[in-house]
Amino acid sequence: MEYSTGQHLLVVPEIKKYVLTNTFSGEEHIVTEQMLKSAFKDEYNKIMSNRNSAWTVTDFYE
């Protein structure tokens, strides 16, 4: 195996993360899209488009 070319590196797809913020308490959580879908079900689309008065979602960058 030729290590100088980087051919041995494994690539794993990044899982997109979001910061979920409670607008009343200011509490923040780092979540994935699947976590949001599981937790909010019918409200998911509203929360993702920031049309929910209790929650806002922003992109998380590491």
Curated annotation (Swiss-Prot):
It comes from the Viruses. Pfam families: Gp45_2 (PF17470). This is Protein Gp45.2. It comes from Escherichia phage RB69 (Bacteriophage RB69).
